[in-house]
Amino acid sequence: MGTPKHFTKKSAIRRLRRAELPSDTIELARFLIGKVVVHELSAGRVSGRIVETEAYPPGDPAGHHFRGPTPRIRSMYLAPGHAYVFFNYGAHFMLNVSGEPAGSAGGILIRAVEPLEGIELMKKHRHCSDLLGLTRGPGRLAAAFQINRSHDGIDLCAEKELWLGVITGEGVKSDTETVIGETVRIGIKRAADHVLRFYETGSPFVSGPKRLLGTEPFAGSKKINFVAKREAKAKPRERDSDATRVDTSARVAGGKSVGTKAGPRRPK
């Protein structure tokens, strides 16, 4: 496919600063579309422009953090911009980015990138010659970038080998020109109807079934407060007082109940 359209010889990649990152998982998932993942390897540098993410905000039943902190997911509780890497179904590593203020948990799964630098090296890592399929999907991405559990907890905004960046230079497509689509997330059973997957419309590097890809642009961040919903569900239901108690003994022709207020109870 030649030189990536978003990256030319006059382009450069600047590291993202933590101050630039939204401290909200859903907003950060959208913000990361068009940004870059870079891994500095001994054999060379590989990089890719993020074209697809999924958000797993606080209280999300589909998130690893739903039941609270454990040593395995401690990276999810770090400040926005840290790597959370897990091994999925004993087969693939997956790269996530922490998305909430330190002490709270939320994660963004990086689902797909458009390869920019080190493409031949990525093909070697994947034993794959198909550019379109090289990093389309979180497992493929991690394999192409050689990301594993040793990278869990890395500060992606610091001077580390694995980091997040933004493309700068002449002819670079600005974020405002990128049209972001939204759909439900892929491959989950809990909270499967929530629209928390974001992608660059028109990108051939986006993963998943094509039937999910709509044409409408993202209209704005949808705040889905799983924590509030969970607390509301757990709150005990208030009992009716005598003043508002429904007298179900009253009947009309046809046997239907009449909703009337009962008077004070008579002493027996």
Give the residues covered by each predicted segment.
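Intrinsically disordered, low-complexity tandem-repeat regions
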Residues: 240-247, 252-259
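Conserved, well-structured core segments that form or line functional sites
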Residues: 2-240, 259-268
